[in-house]
């Protein structure tokens, strides 16, 4: 059955196709004979209770100089036989939330939305990991700079980060004796107005921050370890980390087994777990990445696994 695959993403002209997971999904959908539709940025709306989008027919190809072609934009009304790939990057700001609310109406009209709009609203990527405390390192989330400071001092070293960042932005490592600790906490909490996450520093970060992908609740057999370079402690590829594929360890599979069933139950078809050493640190649900790197290193087709699940869901 041929489907209409509607992609909501950041501007397609600015992506780097060698690393872009959304591009891998589009290639796979096109290979299967599905029709691709690109939503104009800001192009979701509600008309008299119906979810609609300004879309253009899209074709994609493995060409770094010219990787897509768009047709003319028209209005599409969401309904059955459609799959919506919600792939906008964080921050999960008010406009992002509004888009998920439009997509919830699309879902009620019969479109299949990946990932589930309600789940995208419910799961902050930093806080969602704490729903599985058996998997996590010691963590404190607070607006209280004094409480956060006490946590850092109690553990010797900690990582401090905002709840709305991505790609390693505004993440600090601090500890006992750091003269900048107070100002870091003042900045992150915005003087006590913003929740900030403090997590015990995990020395295993030197071996990489592992990205484990879940497809329909099941882990891909390989993860991408994002290894910090030089004197950097952040492994994020966006922060200069080097990606190295590895088979999942027994502990990785245990963590995936703790998280996967709940993600599947909530309609989170494609999820990225961040694991450092033996600990889950984040659950990424908005636009997880690393598919292209893992596909290239191990001859995988992870987007194929996703579309197997999508097509099975559409057939039900």
Swiss-Prot record:
Keywords: ATP-binding, Glutathione biosynthesis, Ligase, Magnesium, Manganese, Metal-binding, Nucleotide-binding
Cofactor binding note: Binds 1 Mg(2+) or Mn(2+) ion per subunit.
Binding, ATP: 151-208
PROSITE patterns associated with the record: ATP_GRASP (PS50975)
Keyword presence, ATP-binding: yes
CC per GO annotation: cytoplasm
UniProt cofactor(s): Mg(2+); Mn(2+)
Domain ATP-grasp: 124-311
Sequence positions that bind Mg(2+): 282, 284
MF (Gene Ontology): ATP binding; glutathione synthase activity; metal ion binding
Catalytically driven reaction(s): gamma-L-glutamyl-L-cysteine + glycine + ATP = glutathione + ADP + phosphate + H(+)
Top EC class of this enzyme: ligase
Keyword Nucleotide-binding attributed: yes
Superkingdom assignment: Bacteria
Catalytic activity, EC: 6.3.2.3
Pathway(s) where this gene product acts: Sulfur metabolism; glutathione biosynthesis; glutathione from L-cysteine and L-glutamate: step 2/2
Membership in a protein family: Belongs to the prokaryotic GSH synthase family.
Protein name per the record: Glutathione synthetase
Protein source organism: Xanthomonas campestris pv. campestris (strain ATCC 33913 / DSM 3586 / NCPPB 528 / LMG 568 / P 25)
């Amino acid at each position: 059955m041929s489907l209409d695959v509607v992609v909501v993403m950041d501007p397609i002209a600015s992506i780097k196709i060698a690393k872009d997971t959304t591009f891998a999904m589009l290639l796979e959908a096109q290979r299967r004979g599905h029709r691709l539709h690109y939503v104009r940025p800001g192009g979701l709306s509600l008309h008299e209770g119906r979810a609609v989008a300004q879309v253009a027919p899209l074709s994609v190809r493995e060409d770094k100089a010219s990787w897509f072609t768009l047709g003319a934009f028209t209005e599409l009304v969401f309904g059955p036989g459609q799959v919506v790939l919600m792939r906008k990057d964080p921050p999960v700001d008010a406009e992002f939330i509004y888009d998920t609310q439009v997509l919830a109406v699309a879902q009620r009209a019969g479109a299949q939305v990946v990932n589930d709009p309600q789940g995208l609203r419910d799961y902050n990527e930093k806080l969602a990991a704490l729903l599985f405390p058996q998997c996590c390192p010691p963590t404190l989330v607070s607006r209280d700079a004094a409480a956060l400071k006490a946590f850092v001092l109690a553990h010797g070293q900690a990582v401090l980060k905002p709840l709305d960042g991505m790609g390693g932005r505004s993440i600090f490592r601090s500890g006992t004796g750091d003269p900048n600790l107070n100002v870091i906490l003042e900045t992150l909490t915005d003087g006590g107005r913003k929740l900030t996450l403090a997590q015990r520093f995990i020395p295993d970060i030197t071996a990489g921050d592992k990205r484990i992908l879940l497809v329909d609740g099941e882990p891909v057999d390989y993860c991408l370890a994002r290894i910090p370079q030089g004197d950097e402690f952040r492994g994020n590829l966006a922060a200069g980390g080097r990606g190295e594929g590895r088979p999942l360890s027994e502990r990785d599979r245990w963590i995936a087994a703790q998280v996967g069933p709940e993600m599947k139950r909530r309609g989170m078809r494609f999820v990225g777990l961040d694991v450092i050493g033996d600990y889950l640190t984040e659950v990424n649900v908005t636009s997880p990445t690393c598919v292209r790197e893992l596909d290239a290193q191990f001859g995988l087709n992870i987007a194929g696994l996703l579309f197997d699940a999508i097509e099975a869901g559409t057939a039900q």
